Regions:
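Amide-forming acyltransferase catalytic core, primarily the GNAT-like/NAT-type
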Residues: 3-49, 103-105, 119, 124-226
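Basic, Lys/Arg-rich alpha-helical nucleic-acid-recognition elements, primarily the DNA-binding modules
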Residues: 29-32, 58, 78, 100
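Extended, composition-driven regions rather than compact fold-specific motifs
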Residues: 39-45, 53, 258-260, 267
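Conserved GNAT-family N-acetyltransferase fold
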Residues: 44, 55-57, 74, 79, ...
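Acetyl-CoA-dependent GNAT
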Residues: 50-54, 58-67, 210-216
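Active-site/acyl-donor-binding loops of N-acyltransferases
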Residues: 61, 108-153, 208-310
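A conserved beta-turn-beta hairpin within the catalytic core of GNAT-like acetyltransferases
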Residues: 64-76, 86, 214-224
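Conserved acetyl-CoA-binding loop-helix of GNAT-fold acetyltransferases
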Residues: 78-81, 86-101, 233-245
């Protein structure tokens, strides 16, 4: 771990409590918190008297769009408190400091995912809204991936004219309520995640993003993390050819898709929550009820790449 990183102590805490593989080296937070083109992470930390980090809450600036245009927004990310310091109100202390700082960038609210236990706490005690469980479907290739090219993502590809062209109009589809806004710079940053290796699947009506993981019973699985309809596509895009391409590229017999997309249809069998290691709930908190009223807030599209699972 790079001890000179401003996130070194936080990486150590998150490695101990959340995910050792992802956080231990420190590279993930240097990227996720420090290299975001939409702004560095807004963080609140609590250390004990000996200087050990015992509490952390981090949120990440992004942009959302509505029919009226785009606005700064916030993705709520990592929360951790040392087991020895729990039930001391550390999350409340950090949240009360971070909310006004997040609102200060012009964001009317924040959204993210939480497990069922944590979501119950923030909904009941902190005024967040439950936007629904993030569904997951299990599917297999049933059509040939006709017309779809697979591109392994690396630094050279992300710096290429081809990537710039593919990512030139990611927000081409209409929006009804709220949705994360994407452009080439933001997608390029997102695909530089040091914890994942992505493949793009470029077809006539969409660009999909996949990674390799394991599904139920440890079966190798392609995970479709995002589907971007291309300009001129007939909506909704039927994702069968992209599922097949993802399985081909990831050398997996099955595919998992999580979330929902207002302009894409992914057919499959819903994965029961008992087979999911950590079922996720999509949650929202408003900072400005005039701009983002809680009762009416909806997200058109939420997929794995809109969060930080992959």
């Amino acid at each position: 771990m790079n001890r000179d990183s401003p996130y070194a102590a936080t990486s150590e805490l998150l490695a101990d409590l959340l995910n050792d593989r992802r956080f231990r080296s420190g590279e993930f937070l240097d990227w996720f918190y420090g290299a975001n083109p939409r702004g560095k992470a807004i963080v609140e930390d609590i250390d004990d008297d000996a200087g050990k980090r015992i509490g952390h809450y981090g949120v990440v600036p992004t942009r959302y769009r509505t029919p009226a245009g785009t606005t700064p927004f916030i993705f709520t990310s990592n929360v951790a408190t040392d087991p020895g310091a729990r039930r001391k109100g550390l999350f409340r202390e950090m949240a009360e400091r971070i909310y006004p700082r997040a609102a200060g960038i012009g964001a009317p609210g924040l959204a993210g995912t939480s497990n069922a236990q944590s979501s119950a706490v923030i909904i009941n005690r902190f005024g967040w809204k439950d936007l629904g469980s993030m569904p997951a479907v299990f599917t297999v290739p049933v059509v040939w991936p006709r017309g779809v090219r697979d591109i392994r993502v690396d630094d050279a590809f992300l710096a290429s004219d081809e990537f710039a062209a593919l990512a030139s109009d990611l927000d081409c589809v209409p929006v009804r309520d709220w949705v994360q806004s994407w452009d080439a710079e933001f997608l390029g940053w997102r695909l530089r995640n040091p914890d994942s290796t992505y493949t793009l699947h470029v077809g006539p009506d969409a660009v999909a993003v996949s990674v390799r993981d394991h599904g139920p019973l440890g079966i190798p699985a392609a995970v479709v993390c995002k589907v971007f309809p291309r300009p001129g596509a007939k909506l909704p895009v039927v994702a069968g050819r992209y599922v097949a391409a993802a399985c081909r590229a990831q050398r997996a017999p099955v595919c998992v898709y999580g979330g929902w997309n207002a302009h894409v249809r992914v057919r499959g069998v819903k994965v029961p929550e008992r087979f999911r290691p950590s079922p996720l709930v999509v949650v929202f908190k408003s900072f400005d009820e005039d701009r983002a009223p809680t009762p009416a807030f909806r997200i058109d599209t939420w997929e794995f790449l809109d969060g930080d699972v992959y």
